[in-house]
Amino acid sequence: MNQPTTRRDFRFSSRLRVRWAEVDMQKIVFNAHYLMYFDTAIADYWRAMAIPYEETMHQWGGDLYVKKASVEYFASARYEDQLDVMLKCVKVGNSSVVFHGAIFRADQLLVTCELVYVYANPATQTSQPVPVEFRELLTAFEAGEPMTSVKTGDVHTLGADAFALREEVFVNEQGFALEIEQDAYDATSVHAVAYNRLAQPVATGRLLPSKELQTPSDPIKSSKIGRMAVHRVMRGSKLGRDIMNTLMAAAKSRGDAEIVLHAQCSAINFYAKQGFTERGLPFDEEGVLHIEMFKLL
């Protein structure tokens, strides 16, 4: 089987910067760390497929175990180099999954690898057939197909999935009280939920009804986005951006001229990248610092 050797051969890429602890006495990356780079990139590969790996494997009743890992070296990486670790699923057998990988510094190929996994029962570690859903996911991803879709609807159509994800993020993870997580606004809001190809909800948000605001010139319609939640292991995969874009499009289509939100201060940079601007001073909301942000549509 031919090993992919150019960047164009790969859909998936994960970037890293070489740390001081990873170089040896020769001032190059210690050889064993390259395998760690590939192994770490596998987690990003599942994220790119929008799969919460642990819970998905638990539902299927199996897990992947490394059967073989081989690495071939062509050139060395050094401290502070930015590297792109690229992976491609090249074969799915009855119980095996084979990946080819490559590490590039810009366009220079440094390392290639082959990783062979066996899908097995975690209790007995005996091989078992790769689930059809898993096989189809891998095929679709490598074919360049989208891994998620965003649906909008009311509380009756999307509420159950939105509430389950919000409870996991806001109550279980962030410690907000369950009784305040859902409120009266849910009944009148537009809800957006992002689903992966297994129909698992992985991100959500809501758009409240419009309000009319008086401005120095003319009144405008303003609305509020809130309850933005992304599955913990999916963060950084642009799902939050997709939810925001969907809700902003819904607001614009009904004639809203402004979107406001109360951002947790730890998330200011995320909203700023979506074009939002801070307004006013930080304030306490349920024991967490927030700040109002807005965007004109």
Which residues make up each language-model segment?
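Short amphipathic alpha-helix that is part of the acyltransferase structural core
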Residues: F38, P146-E179, D186-H191, Y195-Q200
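A short, internal acetyl-CoA/4′-phosphopantetheine-binding micro-motif in the GNAT/acyltransferase core
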Residues: V118-N121, M228-R235
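Conserved beta-strand-loop-alpha-helix junction that forms the acyl-donor binding cleft
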Residues: V260-N269, D284-G287
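Terminal targeting signals and extreme-terminal segments of soluble enzymes
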Residues: M1-D84, V90-V150, A192
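Conserved acetyl-CoA-binding loop-helix of GNAT-fold acetyltransferases
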Residues: V230, G236-A249
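Conserved GNAT acetyl-CoA-binding A-motif
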Residues: M244, A251-Q264
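C-terminal "cap" of GNAT-fold acetyltransferases
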Residues: D284-L297
